[in-house]
Curated annotation (Swiss-Prot):
Stated name of the protein: Lipopolysaccharide-induced tumor necrosis factor-alpha factor homolog
Species assigned in the record: Mus musculus (Mouse)
Region (Membrane-binding amphipathic helix): 111-134
Keyword Zinc on entry: yes
Cellular location(s): Cytoplasm; Nucleus; Lysosome membrane; Early endosome membrane
Single GO MF annotation: zinc ion binding
Entry's free-text remark on domains: The PPxY motif mediates interaction with WWOX and NEDD4. The LITAF domain is stabilized by a bound zinc ion. The LITAF domain contains an amphipathic helix that mediates interaction with lipid membranes. It interacts specifically with phosphatidylethanolamine lipid headgroups, but not with phosphoglycerol, phosphocholine, phosphoserine or inositolhexakisphosphate.
Membrane topology: Peripheral membrane protein
Signal peptide: none
Pfam families per the UniProt record, alphabetical: zf-LITAF-like (PF10601)
GO CC entries: cytoplasmic side of early endosome membrane; cytoplasmic side of late endosome membrane; cytoplasmic side of lysosomal membrane; cytoplasmic side of plasma membrane; Golgi apparatus; Golgi membrane; lysosomal membrane; nucleoplasm
Length: 161
């Protein structure tokens, strides 16, 4: 026969491989230094033998240090600063500074400078038969006061002019 090809079996006796070598045998780790003997469990080493016969360390108990009262202790006070709220002609959700509750403000419309200017302008244009009082009925021409619905405190005012 000729030389074996890539897909032909080699001629001769077949050798069954044995177990591969261990890592230490392959790399040669600790080949010059002998391994130290394992510690014997018992009272000499501080190990306690458990119910399964294996050694285990005794539990370490940690005592928490007792805090020492400091005569120079400083009391810390937290101060919350509320951002300024801009009031417009719509209800505003905010924390009431009087009752410290989260609320949505109630609105109240009052005659302001724009209402009176509108009334005066209508009088000058000739609406003297009562039509000059129409601005007092239109909320869009009046100032707006914001009140807390819980404690009824005045929280702010929106002036149109």
């Amino acid at each position: 026969m000729s030389a074996p090809g890539p897909y032909q079996a080699a001629a001769g006796p077949s050798v069954v491989p044995t177990a591969p070598p261990t890592y230490e045998e392959t790399v040669g780790v600790n080949s010059y230094y002998p391994t130290p003997p394992a510690p014997m469990p018992g009272p000499a080493t501080g190990l306690i033998t458990g119910p399964d016969g294996k050694g285990m360390n005794p539990p370490s108990y940690y005592t928490q240090p007792v805090p020492v009262p400091n005569a120079n202790a400083i009391a810390v006070q937290t101060v919350y600063v509320q951002q300024p709220v801009s009031f417009y002609d719509r209800p505003v959700q905010m924390c009431c500074p009087s009752c410290s509750k989260m609320i949505v403000t109630q609105l109240s419309y009052n005659a302001g400078a724009l209402t009176w200017l509108s009334c005066g302008s209508l009088c000058l244009l000739g609406c003297v038969a009562g039509c000059c009082f129409i601005p007092f009925c239109v909320d869009a021409l009046q100032d707006v006061d914001h009140y807390c619905p819980n404690c009824k405190a005045l929280l702010g005012t929106y002036k149109r002019l």
